[in-house]
Amino acid sequence: MTTTAEQAPAAAPQAFSKAPGTGVALVTGASSGIGEDTAHKLRALGYIVYGAARRTDRLQALTADGIRPLAMDVTDDASMSSGVNRILEETGRIDVLVNNAGYGSYGAIEDVPIDEARRQFEVNVFGLARLTQLITPHMRTRGSGTIINISSIGGRLTTPLGGWYHATKYAVEALSDALRIELSPFGIDVVVVEPGGIRTEWASIAADHLEATAEGSAYADQIRDVAGAMRSESNRRHYSPPEVIARTVGKIVTARHPRTRYAVGFMAKPLIAARRVLPDRAFDQLIGAAFGFRR
């Protein structure tokens, strides 16, 4: 009988060992940056790795390392179900899920079209949640598994003109906390990774989205300041390479008891600490200055 994403195999559960060289991993958003490096890291640890993205042409370079490309659109339920079914049919298991697919769409709350805000939630939140729904029944049956949600320090603090993006990441943090509690009795670890400044395409893509909202906007000066900070090479040269996130994922999947959260990358820990201890208005001033706001 064909195994489906909604129904785990009927075979007797086999516990997953966290020793390197065992298991099957699925990484979304694997065509570049954090996802690509994470797929390579898991492969180096001995996993059978499926790297998923909407466009498989951008995944072909992964095949040289033995990574299996998987066409998957996290906004399309049929696409996700088909991808999960393929993995289960080929391997009979999914031991690690890395929910990495996502993007940042910046702009003033007033300016961003509500359809774009919805799309960002579809990719960053509902896609993550639905893929998790498809895989957790299988992990529960096996009595083990690791779900790693790539969030952001943007799920712990807010930057100018990023309200819609930050709302998606705050949602990921909350969903992850609930999942961790719900899935713990079944032997499934749920871990959040919160990248700080990482040297990927993310900032330039977010700046493109932001600048698209500038024409005729009452927030044009703020848009110019924030987009400039995002594109600044003087900022980017301090950013951490995406390998730091991949190495963190490697630590998580081999740890007997991984931490619930890992803040990693340029300024991740200091900014989260500052948000925790500073009053709201003091933090507003700090983060505004970092983005070059003129008052």
Predicted region positions:
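The beta1-alpha1 cofactor-binding region of Rossmann-like NAD(H)/NADP(H)-dependent oxidoreductases
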Residues: 72-82, 114-115
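A glycine-rich helix->loop->beta "capping" turn
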Residues: 86-99, 105
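Residue(s) in the substrate-gating loop at a strand-loop-helix junction
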Residues: 152
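Conserved glycine-rich cofactor-binding loop
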Residues: 31-32
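C-terminal beta-strand-loop-alpha-helix "lid" module of Rossmann-like NAD(P)-dependent dehydrogenases
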Residues: 185-235
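Substrate-binding pocket helix/loop in short-chain dehydrogenase/reductase
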Residues: 108-109, 116-118
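Active-site helix of classical SDR
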Residues: 132, 168
